[in-house]
Swiss-Prot record:
Active site: S537
Compositionally biased residues, Polar residues: 710-725, 791-801
Record protein name field: Phospholipase DDHD1
Subcellular location: Cytoplasm
Keywords for this protein: Cytoplasm, Hereditary spastic paraplegia, Hydrolase, Lipid metabolism, Neurodegeneration, Phospholipid metabolism, Phosphoprotein
Mechanisms controlling activity: Phosphatidate (1,2-diacyl-sn-glycero-3-phosphate, PA) can positively regulate phospholipase A1 activity.
Record has Ribonucleoprotein as a keyword: no
Pathway in which the depicted protein is active: Phospholipid metabolism; phosphatidylinositol metabolism
GO terms (BP aspect): phosphatidylinositol metabolic process; positive regulation of mitochondrial fission
Pathology linked to this chain's protein: Spastic paraplegia 28, autosomal recessive: A form of spastic paraplegia, a neurodegenerative disorder characterized by a slow, gradual, progressive weakness and spasticity of the lower limbs. Rate of progression and the severity of symptoms are quite variable. Initial symptoms may include difficulty with balance, weakness and stiffness in the legs, muscle spasms, and dragging the toes when walking. In some forms of the disorder, bladder symptoms (such as incontinence) may appear, or the weakness and stiffness may spread to other parts of the body.
Length: 900
């Protein structure tokens, strides 16, 4: 059953050449499906390294599949399975002796010669974008290759034959109007699967026009060559009407083809492309391109392309071709009459020669314009015709493939995902596209690339159902719904009822994606593949809690156990005291039994880590993590290591990225060493900066107090700038210091209110409020100058209490203050140890990195847009890739050049 126009293999008698040609074979009994040509994989022992052969795939054997005769002397003959994943293919070099060959009908039985995919007479095409990923197509003009071998180099043969698989190009629809080409590696594999589908079923079940239903003429196109073959009239999408039964249906299973770096799969039976690692409602149409529009190299609709290809073969098969795509064809066809014309539904095609084909619209307006311009002396083609090209401008080769993925990045979203379903997928696509541009520009010498995978955890959560929506008033409903879909996620996470659901949702999705990626890339872990996480907004906090295992319920129970107050026994009776003693003894006994039980459980089963992988880099973008840590009692330490907030055995490197006007972002460095509140964050380089200074070589700079508004008066201004190893003298800083102040204000809210009320209501019984306020301000200044003392040494004397006769308010404030200063010691005793030489300690690595503001950027407008501006930023993409590729250049013997 012949399917002309479907790229069926060509025979050497059409080539004008004898031996040494190339094509494919699948088995001798499959030849009827391809009009005499079938495909197989041949392993040639001791192959000639100079024969120019390029292997396409290692083909899996199927029982009962007969191979081409005359090939019994070879080692392996394997049946075709074009849909194996990348790791199951064996793309061995020509030196290994493996090659993909095609045997035409009649020559395989007689021991005739075969033609390789790249014959020795034609040098292989050299791609201009050979360095780097190549997972995305790019415009034809940017991806056009240098062709060698003269005018005959465009086509493998000098006569008209069926298009070869390397001349056909598959496309996917990037938007509603634009088709984007698959890279050569992907296109060859899709074409191989498509031809396998043709030879098993006779046609594609779900094909045709991607934007509508396909309608095929029952009679097919008129044949100008006089041939009246029903099979030749088939458009390629309709089932054959010859009555032949499909062959080998049981032997070949058409599996999806992995494309675009393994992120997507193509189902040739449905003509669709869909993502592997995330859900997408709209499937992506794919199309097989044979005829292309001049200039843009966009493919004609598949229905019209199939009809034109069939008509072209019927009229010009075996005739000489002269077209050469290396030279611009500017030869005028004025005065030339069309040698052949073919009518389509809305257009018609004129052939002025074998390789001069023009498409004309048959719309009324086009006909009128064509008539007028022709009367003015213009040719028909130059006035309204569109030149068509047969075969894609760039031949597909196996070398045009994406580089190996050695580093994956999970991109975690924050709040607002419920409001815009699938937003994280679009944001990750923007970040991936920005990273591809940066890789081509700055990391083109790398043979590997970084892959970004979106982590969508919000849509699978149930939470309260629609309870919050049911209690929402109808007035300004749009604003309320927006708040319910965005800011409500913060309240859910702070709720002890729903927090675990959010944590488990993200944890399970991270582990699912990692397991799926490793199953599709088995050598990822063996070759030392690394994993990083990029989190945004609230996603930073949830990711941090998953990695560290922070549980507020468990910590609260520990706090209650350590802070349990003994009742006053002075007014108890003897019987009450006796019962209380028995209660304590019983509790102690119960605690011992619980500890023994936990010990037995711990010895019998080991606790599995929350994540199945170690995080190499944890990037926080627009992160409020510092505020959450401050509210949990984290205070500056004395080690200068990120272990103070995130141990290195959990995550190798923590990096905090923020825009200076992002209202949600806060600094992390002042939570490790307090005096870093006076040191500015590291400025992130612009992506187009030439020869930027490496981040580890950048010296620290101080925040300019003159440019930052403060609440201190002129008399309290500081005239000198402290050294980087001294504690800050300013009473309050714009950066960093607000973290501690906000944390203290949130935890001691009740104490502050009580203190304020005590000062206002009872100041008449003590000192004046003016004196009190002045002394309080002075004491506050002194506290800022002092290093942070350990909670055990902190007493009520360190701060001025309201001096009044209100014993109740003073006592309440004292107790709340004492609880606050003891909280870090109770929860994190290892993080509050201080050193007298605290001023000499510096950070091992910088953590806070700040994007540069635009020269004409409005800060007020930027405050609205900056929180969501990270995804498409090329500066952020360059920063991420700089640290992800850094491990390839690290030298263990190299001294640490980080200044702080």
């Amino acid at each position: 059953m012949n399917y002309p126009g479907r790229g069926s293999p060509r025979s050497p008698e059409h080539n004008g050449r004898g031996g040494g040609g190339g094509a494919w074979e699948l088995g001798s009994d499959a030849r009827p499906a391809f009009g005499g040509g079938v495909c197989c994989f041949e392993h040639l022992p001791g192959g000639d390294p100079d024969d120019g052969d390029v292997p396409l795939a290692l083909l899996r054997g199927e029982p009962g599949l007969h191979l081409a005769p005359g090939t019994d002397d070879h080692n392996h003959h394997l049946a075709l399975d074009p849909c194996l994943s990348d790791e199951n293919y064996d793309f061995s070099s020509a030196e290994s002796g493996s090659s993909l060959r095609y045997y035409s009908e009649g020559e395989s039985g007689g021991g005739g010669s075969s033609l390789s995919l790249h014959p020795p007479q034609q040098p292989p095409l050299v791609p201009t974008n050979s360095g780097g990923g190549g997972a995305t197509g790019g415009s034809p003009g940017e991806r056009k290759r240098t062709r060698l071998g003269g005018p005959a180099a465009r086509h493998r043969y000098e006569v008209v034959t069926e298009l070869g698989p390397e001349e056909v190009r598959w496309f996917y629809k990037e938007d509603k109007k634009t088709w984007k080409p698959f890279i050569g590696y992907d296109s060859l594999r899709i074409e191989l699967a498509f031809r396998t589908l043709l030879q098993t079923t006779g046609a594609r079940p779900q094909g045709g026009d991607r934007d509508g239903d396909h309608v095929c003429s029952p009679t097919g196109p008129a044949s100008s060559s006089g041939e009246d073959d029903d099979e030749d009239r088939a458009c390629g999408f309709c089932q054959s009407t010859t009555g032949h039964e499909p062959e080998m249906v049981e032997l070949v299973n058409i599996e999806p083809v992995c494309v675009r770096g393994g992120l997507y799969e193509v189902d040739v039976t449905q003509g669709e492309c869909y993502p592997v690692y995330w859900n997408q409602a709209d499937k992506i149409p794919v199309m097989r391109g044979q005829w292309f529009i001049d200039g843009t190299w966009q493919p004609l609709e598949e229905e019209e392309s199939n009809l034109i290809e069939q008509e072209h073969l019927n009229c010009f098969r075996g005739q000489q071709m002269q077209e050469n795509f290396d030279i611009e064809v500017s030869k005028s066809i004025d005065g030339k009459d069309a040698v052949h014309s073919f009518k389509l539904s809305r257009n018609h095609v004129d052939w002025h020669s074998v390789d001069e084909v023009y498409l004309y619209s048959d719309a009324t307006t086009s006909k009128i314009a064509r008539t007028v311009t022709q009367k003015l002396g213009f040719s028909k083609a130059s006035s309204s015709g569109t030149r068509l090209h047969r075969g894609y401008v760039e031949e597909a080769t196996l070398e045009d493939k994406p580089s190996q993925t050695t580093h994956i990045v999970f991109v975690v979203h924050g709040i607002g995902q419920k409001m815009d379903q699938g937003r994280i997928i679009k944001n990750t696509a923007m970040m991936r596209e920005a990273a591809r541009k940066i890789e081509e520009r700055h990391f083109s010498n790398h043979a590997t690339h970084v892959e970004f995978l979106p982590v969508e955890w919000r849509s699978k959560l149930t939470l309260d159902g629609d309870t919050v929506d049911s209690i929402t008033p109808d007035k300004v409903r749009g604003l309320r719904d927006m708040l319910n879909s965005s800011a409500m996620d913060i309240m859910y996470y702070t709720s002890p009822l729903y927090r675990d659901e959010l944590v488990k949702g993200l944890q399970q999705e991270l582990n699912r994606l990692y397991s799926l990626f490793c199953s599709r890339n088995p050598d990822f872990e063996e070759k030392g593949g690394k994993v990083s996480i990029v989190s945004h907004s609230l996603g930073c906090v949830i990711t941090y809690d998953i990695m560290t295992g922070w549980n507020p319920v468990r910590l609260y129970e520990q706090l209650l156990q350590k802070e349990e107050e003994l009742p006053d026994e002075r007014w108890m009776s003897y019987e009450e005291r006796h019962l209380l003693d028995e209660l304590y003894i019983t509790k102690r006994r119960l605690k011992e039994i619980e500890e023994r039980l936990h010990g037995l459980k711990a010895s019998s089963m080991t606790q599995t880590p929350a994540l199945k992988f170690k995080v190499e880099n944890f990037f926080c973008m627009g992160s409020p993590l510092a505020v959450f840590l401050a509210l949990r009692g984290i205070r500056p330490g004395n080690t200068g290591s990120q272990d103070h907030i995130l141990p290195r055995e959990i995550c190798n490197r923590l990096l905090n990225i923020f825009h200076p006007t992002d209202p949600v972002a806060y600094r992390l460095e002042p939570l490790i060493l307090k005096h870093y509140s006076n040191i500015s964050p590291v400025q992130i380089h612009w992506y187009n900066t030439s020869n930027p200074l490496p981040y580890e070589h950048m010296k620290p700079s101080f925040l300019n107090p003159a440019k930052e508004p403060t609440s201190v008066s002129e008399n309290e201004g500081i005239s000198t700038i402290p050294s980087p190893v001294t504690s800050p003298v300013l009473s309050r800083r714009h950066y960093g210091e607000s973290i501690t102040n906000i944390g203290k204000a949130s935890i001691l809210g009740a104490a502050s209110i009580g203190k304020g009320l005590g000062g206002m209501l009872f100041s008449r019984f003590g000192r004046s409020s003016t004196t009190q306020s002045s002394e309080t301000s002075k004491d506050s200044m002194e506290d800022e100058k002092k290093p942070v003392a350990s909670p055990s040494a902190t007493t009520v004397g360190t701060q001025t209490l309201p001096h009044s006769s209100s014993g109740f308010l003073d006592s309440a404030y004292f107790r709340l203050q004492e609880s606050f200063f003891n909280l870090p010691q109770l929860l994190f005793p290892e993080n509050v140890m201080q050193n007298k030489d605290n001023a000499l300690v510096e950070l091992d690595h910088r953590i806070d990195f700040e994007l540069r503001e635009g020269l004409v950027e409005s800060r007020y407008w930027s405050a609205v847009t900056s929180h969501t501006a990270y995804w498409s930023s090329l500066d952020v993409a360059l920063f991420l890739l700089t640290f992800m590729y850094k491990h390839e250049h690290d030298d263990d013997a190299k001294p640490n050049l980080d200044p702080i």
